[in-house]
UniProtKB/Swiss-Prot annotation:
Catalytic reaction equation(s): (2E)-geranyl diphosphate = (1S,5S)-alpha-pinene + diphosphate
Annotated source species: Fragaria vesca (Woodland strawberry)
Source domain of life: Eukaryota
Protein name: (-)-alpha-pinene synthase
Record-listed E.C. numbers: 4.2.3.119
Disulfide-bond pairs as recorded: none
């Protein structure tokens, strides 16, 4: 007589072990359909664009013809053009003016007050001229300290503070200047001062680390209260901001339509739903109208990378991640059948987006670029998988070994390389090869991103179960406390900014627009991770920034 299994026993025989998945329980998007439907007002936008073109001619004459014989006045106007976000309209004129000023620098560098000397130093240094910081020795007393009389010159102190941030390694004079100015500006900001708002914002985030478009938006309200402001320049800045904002709104609406069709938020609920924040990130890398194509493809690929990150970081099992990594490396739609159901929409979207990019690049005669985009995405998966191995094996690597993987996996290399895909003829194979090999400026940016990210998310990641972070690795290897580790990391971040500054000094290893992609990316990182992880945990900071960039036009 055969033995028949009971229903319960039969169920035990055929059921598979339940898969235990880690999830971070990310909060949903705070934006809903806020940006989904944008109605273009073509007539109004055309009228604004015509006014911009007219004002550009007026400002060009004011700054580069009428002020050409007064270098101090012209430098101030150039600084205002840059801070108001319209320097991209006058790049060649600014370069020519600064070259002329640099040629006479040795003749005039001993003259001028603190404001003008610091402004001249900052603008020349920022544009690659390796001018000496010895020019500031004149502001020291016989004891080698900065003169106490400088403290009451708040505009001069603020100018000196901004200049000190362009220091490179070994510039003790500027290190002392930064301590001196920061201390006294913080004290001044606590008191009633006409410059209080400007000082408070500068101490929180100096110009070097400020996202161009956000900085421009904030500076407009400061600039219009100055006694000697240029009405034409201010009007140009406001109109230009609104014209570009309209363009960004249209782009964001198009991206959201694509994102909604993918239905990622429902099909992959384990991943962060942050498409609006990601577009903000990319607009920080390049906001200019000429980079429409670049923003389009980079936003799509950073969305795909964010989902990939959350798969490798938490939701995917190790066995699934092995299959996914192999599939991405093979880059073949036939791999779909081997993937778990939830991974398939992600994988086909990755292939489709790269196909879309390749089609457009072929039309442009730049099809060679797709190789770099594809390879950098493959490499991103390999880096994520290396971290998954650490977690699977319960491994806490040595700090150097951790950084070799994690400094690149953080995503800066991928974003920097792919950002070149959407640029013009200034980009050749050389620039792709150069960035792919992670030169000093990119290594510095990667270090800043990785360490700031790990500091900002340390407690959250520990609570949910996560691969060892740089903080864990350093504490484990050197036997120091969490706070000691963070202090050491903050010093490394400071040194990495000096590396970035050095890379802008002439002769540069790559065209300045390429360096600017990395710098702008690092500025976004500083904004989002200085006070916690504002990208993952969207709060007032991110909401206010997105409203300023994409919702509220500047009042004219």
């Amino acid at each position: 007589m055969p033995v028949h299994a009971t229903p319960a026993a039969e169920s035990q025989i055929i059921s598979k072990p339940e898969v235990v998945r880690r999830t971070a329980n990310f909060k949903p998007s705070v934006w809903g359909d806020r940006f989904a439907n944008y109605a273009e007002d073509i007539i109004t936008q055309t009228q604004m664009q015509e006014q911009v073109e007219e004002l550009k001619q007026v400002v060009r004459k004011e700054v580069f013809t009428n002020a050409a014989d007064d270098s101090s006045h012209q430098l101030k106007l150039i600084d205002e053009i840059q801070r108001l976000g319209v320097a991209y309209h006058f790049e060649s004129e600014i370069d020519q003016a600064l070259e002329r000023i640099h040629e006479t620098y040795q003749d005039i560098h001993d003259g001028g007050d603190l404001y003008n000397v610091a402004l001249r130093f900052r603008l020349l240094r920022r544009h690659g001229y390796n001018v000496s910081c010895d020019v500031f020795n004149k502001f020291k007393d016989t004891n080698g300290d900065y003169k106490k009389s400088l403290v009451t010159d708040l505009s001069g102190m603020l100018s000196f503070y901004e200049a000190a941030h362009l220091r490179v390694h070994g510039e003790k004079l500027l290190e002392e200047a930064l301590v001196f100015t920061t201390t006294h500006l913080q004290s001044a900001s606590a008191k009633s001062s006409l410059l209080k708002t400007q000082i408070t914002e500068a101490v929180e985030r100096p110009l070097l680390k400020t996202m161009e478009r956000l900085g421009a938006r904030r500076y407009m309200s400061i600039y219009q209260d100055e006694a000697s402001y240029s009405e034409n320049l201010l009007k140009l800045a406001k109109l230009d901001f609104n014209v570009v904002q309209c363009l960004h709104k249209k782009e964001l609406s198009d991206i959201l339509r694509w994102y909604k069709e993918l239905d990622f938020a429902r099909r992959m609920p384990f991943a962060r739903d942050r498409i609006v924040e990601l577009f903000f990130w990319i607009a920080g890398i390049y906001f200019e109208p000429e980079y429409v194509f670049g923003r389009h493809i980079l936003t799509k690929l950073i969305e795909i990378t964010t989902v990939m990150d959350d798969m490798y970081d938490a939701f995917g099992t190790f066995e699934e991640l092995v299959i996914l990594t192999e599939a991405i490396d093979r880059w073949d739609a036939s791999c779909m059948d081997q993937l778990p159901d939830y991974m398939q929409p992600f994988y086909i979207t990755l292939l489709d987006v790269i196909d879309e990019v390749e089609e457009e690049l072929t039309k442009q005669g730049r099809s060679y670029r797709i190789h770099y985009a594809k390879e950098i995405m493959k490499n991103q998966a390999r880096l994520y998988f290396a971290e998954a191995i650490w977690f699977h094996e319960g491994c806490t690597p040595k700090m150097d070994g951790y950084m070799r993987v994690a400094a690149s996996s953080v995503g800066n290399t991928m974003l920097s390389v792919v950002s070149l895909v959407g640029m013009g003829d200034i980009i050749t194979k050389f620039e792709f090869e150069w960035l792919t090999n992670e030169p000093k400026i990119l290594r510095a940016s990667n270090t800043i991103f990785r360490l700031m990210d790990d500091i900002a998310g340390y407690k959250f990641e520990k609570e949910r179960g996560h691969v060892a972070s740089s903080i864990d690795c350093y504490m484990n290897e050197y036997g120091v406390s969490e706070q000691e580790t963070i202090d050491i990391f903050n010093k490394r971040i400071v040194d990495s900014w000096k590396d970035i500054n050095e890379e802008f000094l002439r002769p540069t290893a790559a065209p300045v627009p390429v360096l600017n992609r990395v710098l702008n990316l690092t500025r976004v990182v500083d904004l989002l991770y200085k006070r916690g992880d504002a990208f993952t945990h969207v709060g007032k900071l991110m909401k206010d920034c997105i409203a300023a960039m994409f919702i509220d036009p500047v009042p004219l």
